[in-house]
C-alpha cells in the first residue's frame, strides 16, 4: 500500500504540474483534464465486487497494478511538446481503471487472515500505510525529480522533471506488483492447489 499510494500521489501532483506548467492549462481546465481517469475509475470500481467473486482479490489487485504501471510508464514519456490526448488522457484511462480495480482488493488484502479481535488494529495499520505512502512517496519523488537536467530551463525543464518523477513512480508500482505476485497471488494459488489435491 505504501508503494502504490506513493506512486499515485506522485501521479496527481506531477501531472498537475505538467498540465499547468508545461501545457499552460488554467486551474479549472486542469481539474477537468482529470475527468478521463475519474470516470473510468468510478465505472471500474462499481463492478469490483463482481470481479472479485470471479477472479479473487489477488488476481484483481495484480491486474489493477499492471494497468496503473502501464499508464504511468506511458505518461512518463510526455514531453514539453506532446499533446494532451495521446500523452495524458489515454494514460489516465489506464491509471483510472487500475486504481478502481486495485484499491478495494488492496484494503482487503491488508486485513485478510486477521483474527476478529485484531481487525481494528489491522485496519489502523492499513490507514497508517496509506498516509505514509502519501507523504514519504511524494517526498521521494520530489527529490528524484530535482536531480539532473542542469542544461534545461522553462517548460522543457519542468517536463523533464515530471517525466523523471513519473518514471520513479513506475518503478515503485513495478516493485509493488512483484510483492503482490510473490506474497498474495502465488501463495493463494498454492493453497488452492493443495485444497484441490485434498478433495481429490
Where are these regions (language model features)?
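Transmembrane core module of solute transporters
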Residues: 1-107, 115-117, 169-170
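Transmembrane-helix exit segments and adjacent C-terminal regions of multi-pass membrane proteins
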Residues: 97, 108-109, 155-200
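Small-residue-rich alpha-helical segments with characteristic i,i+4
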Residues: 88-157
Amino acid at each position: 500500500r505504501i508503494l502504490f499510494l506513493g506512486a499515485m500521489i506522485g501521479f496527481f501532483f506531477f501531472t498537475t504540474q505538467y498540465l499547468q506548467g508545461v501545457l499552460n492549462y488554467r486551474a479549472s481546465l486542469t481539474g477537468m483534464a482529470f475527468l478521463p481517469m475519474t470516470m473510468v475509475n468510478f465505472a471500474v470500481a462499481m463492478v469490483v465486487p463482481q470481479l472479485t467473486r470471479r477472479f479473487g482479490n489477488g488476481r484483481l489487485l495484480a491486474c489493477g497494478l499492471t494497468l496503473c504501471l502501464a499508464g504511468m510508464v506511458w505518461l512518463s514519456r510526455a514531453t514539453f511538446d506532446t499533446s494532451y490526448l495521446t500523452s495524458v488522457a489515454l494514460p489516465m484511462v489506464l491509471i483510472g481503471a487500475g486504481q478502481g480495480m486495485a484499491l478495494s482488493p488492496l484494503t482487503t488484502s491488508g486485513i485478510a487472515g486477521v483474527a476478529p479481535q485484531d481487525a481494528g488494529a489491522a485496519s489502523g495499520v492499513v490507514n497508517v500505510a496509506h498516509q505514509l505512502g502519501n507523504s514519504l512517496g511524494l517526498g521521494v519523488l520530489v527529490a528524484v525529480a530535482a536531480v539532473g537536467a542542469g542544461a534545461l530551463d522553462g517548460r522543457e525543464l519542468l517536463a523533464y522533471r515530471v517525466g523523471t518523477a513519473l518514471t520513479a513512480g513506475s518503478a515503485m508500482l513495478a516493485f509493488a506488483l512483484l510483492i503482490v505476485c510473490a506474497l498474495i497471488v502465488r501463495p493463494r494459488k498454492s493453497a488452492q492447489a493443495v485444497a484441490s489435491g485434498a478433495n481429490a
